[in-house]
Amino acid sequence: MLRVAAAVLILSLAASPALAADGQQLFNMQCKMCHGGSPMGPSLAGVAGRKIAEGPFAYSTGLKNKAGTWTDANLDAYLKSPTAFAPGTKMMISVANNENRSAIIGYLKTLK
């Protein structure tokens, strides 16, 4: 049962063109202020698949202490509750809606 749920989650997070377009709109409304060239947050270009807390940014200790990469599951968990995923993180904005998180992740996967 857990494998089926995981497969459904993975498939739901795939970057389809429509999902990415919705994700871009959500990103522009919710994320771009800090992650669109501002020093407030790191650039998210290439974030999907990248090692967590890697790149030219002063990441929080909470994120630096996380092992692994930004998989769909990790991005989903972080967007759902940044402070639960990485206690001490600087990011306080969360995305409660599952579909919105999936759309944002789909868009993030298009950023290179």
Predicted regions and their residues:
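Extracytoplasmic copper-binding redox domains, predominantly the cupredoxin/blue-copper superfamily
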Residues: 26, 54-56, 107
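N-terminal signal peptide c-region/cleavage motif recognized by signal peptidases
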Residues: 10-18
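Axial heme c-ligation environment in periplasmic c-type cytochrome domains
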Residues: 42, 56-105
